[in-house]
């Protein structure tokens, strides 16, 4: 039998166990709050920046090229960019990518932070630029740190440091969002990698899978970048070969300028930031509104403050409730449209230069593996016609310029839609882009031709679409430039239809359809004429055999004359010298030239033909003998028409 003391000890232990269990249960029920570093967040959610799956290598090359172009254009430097990637370790999918440019470079004290620290960038201003979040280069550094033990190699020669070049070996501390500087070295003259006065070079090793589809996307991205940046030299190198996209023009667009925000898009955060910028100057709210926002005059600012009923005092003396009233009044007030002179569109001359020599990378699949012949080459597509149109609009209280171009015919054999935003090619998610909606909604009859004509004359077995415009040999280019592009996702691959954006894109495309309509109608007439000429050539030998003996004329000369008249009739002009003889035979080698009177009415050139009686007599003779021959043959067995039989077949 247990003693009383033993029972008490056991009871106490049971109570302690119950209390401990209750405390543990309470701890499990509590929510733990932790702060995650920016770098850790983006690495864990890499799809937000597009770095996912097979697109890692594509996004890395894209970000490097865009950074290089921004660096050159910001200081009005004609870009020379070299980009390469090669497979280091096939078993582990390790790739070495390298990019070098002749831009302004990065000061040596800013290189580690600019390359490795997330949300640290010079792009967080109201300005048109390719970058959106300033995370592209940081994602490359973080992924290199996460998947490999090889640091980033960086060379930088900044224009601010009198042509001194520094070399860095860097990694990212993903847990703290801070750079790890393994090496920093001032290079001697014989150790320098960058040839120009300034520039930037980076080498990184990434783990990434590369499928044939992704590889083609990389090739297409580089090709399309050269279209909207024809003033740049792009050198692109892979294990399959090296290609160079030459500079087609030395004209560069004016660099984009920083601009004050528009008051129509004001919110509490923007207003507080504007007040903080004037905190040391003890400025009134009136001064803050006039100096921190565009299109706000002194009278307009007074009107806003009066309507809000908050009075004029030092900007830092307003409560949050009073500032909210200011924001609400600004959203209700009508302001002038934002300025567009700070934007940097491509422009007609530059885009036309890109369209006239459209570079595209071609993979040679017939190369012998034993030969040292490169698989990659550049094909240049030259159209017969290009056209350009642009519109200025406001989207979400931000100025936006819509540019549209068309390249038609020539080396272009099929339809293709090119999409660009702030001079960046957009290759993915075309089906959800506003440009695809515009193509679908603007009908082909804007060209003055019917869908039936297009489908009959431009039937393309490779085209899977039943839309008439997609049967034409035509490339359509859409470019949107703004201080903030309405992307659908952070990956910057498709643009949303916001505000009046679609309306102005439709207007541009309609303009271009009208401009190319004359060329398309001309080609349709030429195809019809060729069909009729084949028919004439089929019947001419039959007519010559029937009438040559009755009129005692050499069949060869008669056939030649008939063929010449048929060709000139189809072309609508006679090219032989003028004949003044009254007596003229159909077999004479000289045929009178048709006289053309050319007039221009409202920009339309028209030709009026004046045919001499001699030529008219010749045509009447042909018609007479053709009619007589047709009646004669109708009494005999019908002669089969091989042209029609071919058409039926």
Question: Across the structure, where does each feature detected by a protein language model lie?
Answer:
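A short glycine-centered beta->alpha linker in the GHKL/HATPase_c
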Residues: 105-107
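C-terminal extensions
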Residues: 319-391
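Charged regulatory segments coupled to nucleotide-binding catalytic modules in large multidomain enzymes
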Residues: 2-20, 35, 209-231, 241-273, ...
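Bergerat-fold GHKL ATPase/HATPase_c domain
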Residues: 2-78, 109-116, 254, 259-265
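Helix-hairpin-helix
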Residues: 288-306
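Acidic ATP/Mg2+-coordinating residue in the GHKL
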Residues: 101
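ATP-lid-like helix-loop hinge signature
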Residues: 68-98
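GHKL-type ATPase core
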Residues: 19-26, 121-273, 313-329, 336-338, ...
